């Protein structure tokens, strides 16, 4: 199931400049979602991170992965209309950088949902190379 920006905005509350997912390419509610961020030189964060060698902050990549996971969790029938909050992060590793011109593949697999909590395994990659891996916890409210 492909979702454009307008469909994403119906599911999660994030808006520009903090909506970090351009589209969802594939999604199974409560199971997984794959989204993309097409990074341009005009992203606000590049003005200060770093002017001589622009690099997308790793924590923003983690946030983008969390947004993709939130789309998967909040698309479950019982969670529609709710909000997914960032509850925690474990086993996070930064393995590469993201630069202007990169198309970042963001995949979050939901490995557990119990009550108001969910856990996802998240991976960001550029050109098939993993740049970030993390386990994310979501609080659903």
Each PLM stretch: what is its role?
Residues 1-2, 69-105, 131-139:
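Hydrophobic beta-strand-centered segment that forms part of the acyl-chain substrate-binding groove
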Residues 5-15:
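Short aromatic-glycine motifs in intrinsically disordered, low-complexity regions
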Residues 9, 52, 94-96:
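Beta-strand-rich interaction surfaces with strong enrichment in secreted/lumenal proteins
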Residues 13, 98-102, 109-141:
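HotDog/MaoC-like acyl-thioester-processing domains
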Residues 16-56, 61:
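Catalytic strand-loop segment that frames the active site of acyl-thioester-processing enzymes
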Residues 18-20, 104, 118:
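Hydrophobic core residues within well-ordered beta-strands of beta-rich domains
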Residues 22-25, 90, 95, 109-111:
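Conserved positions in beta-strands of structured domains
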Residues 24, 56-79:
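Active-site helix/loop of acyl-thioester processing domains in fatty-acid/polyketide metabolism
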């Amino acid at each position: 199931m492909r979702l454009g920006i307008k469909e994403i905005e119906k599911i999660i509350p994030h808006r520009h400049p903090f909506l970090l997912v351009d589209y969802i390419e594939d999604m199974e509610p409560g199971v997984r979602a794959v989204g993309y961020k097409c990074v341009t030189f005009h992203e606000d964060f590049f003005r200060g991170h770093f002017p001589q060698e622009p690099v997308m902050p790793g924590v923003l990549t983690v946030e983008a992965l969390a947004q993709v996971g939130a789309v998967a969790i909040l698309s479950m029938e019982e969670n529609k209309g709710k909000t997914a909050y960032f509850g925690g992060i474990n086993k996070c590793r930064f393995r590469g950088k993201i630069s202007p011109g990169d198309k970042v593949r963001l995949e979050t697999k939901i490995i557990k949902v119990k009550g108001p909590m969910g856990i996802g395994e998240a991976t960001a990659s550029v050109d098939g190379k993993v740049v970030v891996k993390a386990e994310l916890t979501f609080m659903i409210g």
